[in-house]
Amino acid sequence: MNELSEFQALQQSLNDSDFVLKTQEQIAKDFGKFNLFFPEEFLTTALSKETIESFVSERIADLMLEGETRLLQLLYTIDLPEKEFLSLTTQPNFLAQLSQRVLYREAYKIYLRKKYS
């Protein structure tokens, strides 16, 4: 499967509430390692893409207060390439773009688990 068709399959998967909830759980798990927690509804209710990105954006902003090293450690845990992160740092909507990348990377983990299990 090529990259484009995998992206399309991932986009389609984000319409499935069970898949979205598993993605939210993965996000909460990875962020929890950095003492960044989400409200109960984040773990129990499949949210819209925009709402998830908003929650993620808030947590990233909190983590940035602790310094760039902590943020890079989180991105390493999520498996978001540093090169990709650096390309976003000059963007005016940095947090929104980074949150979107985090969501898609976490969703991709769930997609691959489902595909190969």
Predicted regions mapped to residue ranges:
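Membrane topogenic helices and adjacent juxtamembrane segments
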Residues: 1-41
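Hydrophobic alpha-helical segments at protein termini of multi-pass membrane proteins
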Residues: 1-14, 60, 70-73, 104, ...
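Conserved phosphate/pyrophosphate-binding and hydrolysis machinery centered on Walker-type P-loop NTPases
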Residues: 13, 17, 42-49, 88-92
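Short, contiguous, helix-prone interaction/anchoring segments in small proteins
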Residues: 26-66
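Intrinsically disordered or highly flexible coil/loop and linker segments, enriched in small
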Residues: 33-37, 69, 108-116
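Amphipathic protein-protein interaction modules
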Residues: 53-97
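Amphipathic alpha-helical binding modules
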Residues: 83-117
